[in-house]
């Protein structure tokens, strides 16, 4: 039996990449053997150093980091961390120095004193259906967010494909989604995921309070092919699937 490495190069896990400016959406998720997507309340409790390195590498690859509102709140999101070398490399590729966190929300109800606003090099974006911006309460939240440095991104409609289209319209071609379950489910259901990075943690976590995917409103069945599978010495399994699209 071959000895497994303690860690893996995240670039190996990312695999082939298309030229900057080419539209591609990647989904990253981790789950225990029982299907649980969190341990002690956060997904970070399931991962190892390689999983964390993959998350950071996908952020550096991306033009936008997409996350659901509840996940951003629960996991106390902050801006993407980059080194001077990474920022220079991104400039050389024609990308912004730092990709923004993009929060998908319908309420715009956020505490602007949190590190999502205070600990970031680039303003967070908030993708919100444009038809709710006329609501008095939502409009007030939008004003508070903008005063705190955030950017409101009106979306034509409430489906996730409209969110992706709105980001593409802003020149944000490379998108990585970090959850949560509702957003993951919507992206998969709408066939918006091109590459799925799925990490399996060798732990049996009970109860499964939060899973990687939630209940879908509309049935869907989309095929993926396995591009790569790698393991580390602690039995963490890193899978990379690519969507099979007809035509």
List where the protein language model places each region.
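Enzymes that bind and transform nitrogen-containing heteroaromatic metabolites
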Residues: 1-247
């Amino acid at each position: 039996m071959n000895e497994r490495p303690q860690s893996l190069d995240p670039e190996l896990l990312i695999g082939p990449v298309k030229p900057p400016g080419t539209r591609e959406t990647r989904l990253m998720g981790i789950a225990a053997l029982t299907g649980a997507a969190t341990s002690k309340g956060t997904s970070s409790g399931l991962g190892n150093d390689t999983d964390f390195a993959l998350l950071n590498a996908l952020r550096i690859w991306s033009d936008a980091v997409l996350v659901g509102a509840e996940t951003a709140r629960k996991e106390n999101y902050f801006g993407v961390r980059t080194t001077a070398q990474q920022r220079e490399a991104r400039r050389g590729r024609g990308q912004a120095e730092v990709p923004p966190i993009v929060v998908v929300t319908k309420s715009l109800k956020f505490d602007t004193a949190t590190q999502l606003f205070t600990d970031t090099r680039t303003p967070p974006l908030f993708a919100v259906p444009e038809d709710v911006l006329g609501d008095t309460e939502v409009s007030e939240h939008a004003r508070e967010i903008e005063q705190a440095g955030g950017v409101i991104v009106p979306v034509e409609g409430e489906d996730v494909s409209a969110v992706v289209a709105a980001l593409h319209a802003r020149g944000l071609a490379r998108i990585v989604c970090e959850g949560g379950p509702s957003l993951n489910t919507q992206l998969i259901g709408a066939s918006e995921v091109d590459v799925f990075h799925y990490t399996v943690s060798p732990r049996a976590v009970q109860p499964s309070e939060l899973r990687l995917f939630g209940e879908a409103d509309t049935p869907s069945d989309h095929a993926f092919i396995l591009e790569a599978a790698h393991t580390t010495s602690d039995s963490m399994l890193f899978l990379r699937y690519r969507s099979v699209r007809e035509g």
